[in-house]
Amino acid sequence: MNTRISALAAALLIALAAPAMSADVPQGTIKGKAWVQTDRTMAEAMAQSWTVLPASVTGDRTYEGINIRAPETKGKAPAVIFVHGSGGINPQIKAFQKRLADELVIASFTADSFQLPDRMTYTSPIDPMDYEKIHALRASELTAAVEFLAKQPWFNGRFVIAGTSEGAVAVARYVRAEAAPAEAGRIIFSWSCENNYHVVQHKTRIPDGMPVLNIMSSKDKYFSQANPYLGNHEAVGNCSKALQGNPNARIVLIKDAPHTLMNEPEAREAEDKFLKDVLLK
């Protein structure tokens, strides 16, 4: 009798506690039903990619605009392929690309995933399998972007792949196709390469010895313990575990930085050193 009462009491306490424990966890939502690019929409994602070409490439001034309207080029440059996050090509990404061209003489482009009509969008958290649909979409776009870059008349053969948040998952998981050019390095912004709510498994696939720069906020609102629905009590909030043993990996933690941080002063300093080492030497 006492055992039964204790069990019932424990169950009641758990039931009463459950709402309080989940009070800070929002209810995620999904809009849109498309998560696979067709040949046509993939071509549009590349044609409409935000492209920034240095003045040395155009022979005039820095070009900022969609790829399909880029001017005839007269020079070549190394490149950064950037994979945007869930919010698309935002002003911070455009500013990052502009700085690459003006200060480092590096070309760049960001394919536009939202050329896919009725593309799936979400507010977190949602089911991990639904996130994986988006990750598969973004992986296909990165593979296509590498193929697209190889055909650009201004491309000098050296490039880095970079991405932020949702887009950084694709960068961390990227596996080069046999016929594709090999990247010189990877930059992972605001993704921790860990198991958490955003993936079924993190599935990081970075080759041993690949130069990698991981830049994170010390308290990223999505991928650190600051997130009440992170889903991994052992997560450290950066890629240090996944990159353990890679002598060419660097982790930069920026205290109290926002989730979108590629233009923070400490981030810029780290980006410059990394890109000069892997692309400009």
Feature roles, as predicted:
Residues A9-A17:
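Bacterial N-terminal signal peptides
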Residues G87, S113-P117, C193, D220, ...:
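Alpha/beta-hydrolase active-site loop signature
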Residues Q244-K281:
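C-terminal catalytic histidine-bearing segment of alpha/beta-hydrolase fold enzymes
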